């Protein structure tokens, strides 16, 4: 769980032990595409990690833009820090250094390789591997004058799409999976 939040400087503090696999012996971030998945009340944010600074038993995590600004500007849902230990939960992802459980995989964008930790008894020579490359399979568009209506899909299966936005621009949601493209305040400065 997170330890504290510094909204002004756009920093989340987490236990240092939770990020030890992402930093080298000098404290530098070695997993340049690492992400934090942050549970905050009724939605989950995906935040690309820009830097980590260990400070004793905690670590200050800063995030890439635009999601850092959006995350710390919008009024809710906020990362929770409570007096009874029910702070927002998080986990780290998108780093080869985090692979420690069979079935996990990591896509190294720079090397153009996928690293996979096989499950017991799994033979990669016999595995069916599918790499989704398309985000949109069907697009239905309309206007007020020409609305899209009376559309039905029957006996069709849509499979194997991808959604790369969180890894490319972060994902700061509001509600029902809707993501914010900009921050806002209830009391503008």
Regions found by a protein language model. Name each.
Residues 1-189:
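Extracellular polysaccharide-degrading/modifying enzymes targeting complex plant/algal/animal polysaccharides
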């Amino acid at each position: 769980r997170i330890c504290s939040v510094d909204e002004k400087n756009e920093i989340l503090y987490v236990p240092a032990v939770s990020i030890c696999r992402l930093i080298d012996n000098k404290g530098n971030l070695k997993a340049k595409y690492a992400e934090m998945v942050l549970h905050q009340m009724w939605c989950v944010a995906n935040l690309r990690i820009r830097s980590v600074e260990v400070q004793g038993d905690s670590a200050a995590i800063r995030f890439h833009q635009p999601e850092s600004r959006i995350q710390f500007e919008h009024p809710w849902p906020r990362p929770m820090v409570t007096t009874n230990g029910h702070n927002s939960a998080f986990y780290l992802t998108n780093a080869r250094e985090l692979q420690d459980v069979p079935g996990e995989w990591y896509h190294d964008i720079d090397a153009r390789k996928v690293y996979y930790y096989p499950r017991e008894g799994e033979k990669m020579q016999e595995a069916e591997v599918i790499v989704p490359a398309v985000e949109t399979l069907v697009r239905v568009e309309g206007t007020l004058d020409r609305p899209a209506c009376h559309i039905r899909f029957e006996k069709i299966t849509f499979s194997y799409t991808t959604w790369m936005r969180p890894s490319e621009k972060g994902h700061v949601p509001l509600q029902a999976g809707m993501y914010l493209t900009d921050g806002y305040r209830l009391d503008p400065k």
